[in-house]
Design a protein with these regions (language model features):
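Extracellular S/T/G-rich loop segment that most often corresponds to the catalytic His/Ser-adjacent loop
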Residues: 77-138
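Sec-exported extracytoplasmic/periplasmic mature domains
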Residues: 12-20, 70-74, 142, 146-150, ...
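Short beta->alpha linker loops
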Residues: 1-2, 157
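Short, solvent-exposed loop/turn elements at domain surfaces
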Residues: 54, 117, 124-128, 151, ...
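Caspase-like cysteine protease fold
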Residues: 149-192
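Caspase-like (clan CD) cysteine peptidase catalytic core
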Residues: 4-31, 35-92, 161
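Active-site/binding-pocket entry motifs
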Residues: 51, 122-123, 147
Length: 192
């Protein structure tokens, strides 16, 4: 169950045992809810059972998530976040009715060995492809990693190739309402 304590247990107990410091290339995939603080200073992963009025106490800030992973010392860490921080569900329901309609999260710098793919801009909703019952972002990440993103047909997929494929595909299927983002080195190999 993806509760706050379950996620923290995975980050603090399981992950350090699974990672060989400075040798492991870590891949993290999260699909679920996210929410920004009212001032846009912090973005939170909102696990099962979280109270949206008490984000600091019941959710996990993205910064803490990165710090916990950094403590395990992977050689590289690649993140795929199929969530949004707009405070809406995929059916456009508001998680917290009295929140402003649009909050833009202020991006924090990330370590050089991190590569972060997100489902959309911080004030956008991460939508679903109904016909496959997956988030648009997840679906096109999977298709991209299966080879669709290999633009130059060299049998390897760079972060830049994957991002371009996912961004164009999601943009097309969302009529431009969802724009996936990437932070990090676009020349780094995601799959080789």
């Amino acid at each position: 169950e993806a509760t706050r304590s379950g996620l923290l247990r995975a980050l603090k107990v399981w992950l350090p045992q699974a990672v060989q410091p400075d040798k492991t290339d870590l891949y993290v995939f999260y699909a679920g809810h996210g929410m920004a603080s009212d001032d846009g200073e912090s973005a939170y992963i909102v696990p099962y059972g979280a109270d949206t009025f008490l984000l600091e106490d019941t959710a996990i800030s993205r910064e803490r998530f990165y710090e916990e992973i950094g403590a395990a010392k992977p050689r590289t860490a690649t993140f795929f976040f199929d969530n949004c921080y707009a405070g809406t569900t995929r059916s456009e329901e508001r998680l917290l009715a009295q929140r402003p309609l649009s909050i833009r999260v202020q991006e924090s710098p990330v370590p050089d060995n991190y590569l972060i793919f997100t489902a959309g801009e911080s004030n956008q909703t991460a939508g679903v492809l109904d016909e496959v019952k997956h988030g648009r972002f997840s679906y096109f990440v999977f298709k991209g990693l299966e080879g669709e993103a290999d633009a130059n047909q060299d049998g390897k997929i760079s972060a830049g190739e994957l991002h371009q494929y996912v961004r164009e595909s999601v943009g097309r299927f969302s009529a431009g309402a969802q724009t996936p983002t990437m932070l990090g080195d676009g020349n780094r190999w995601v799959l080789k």
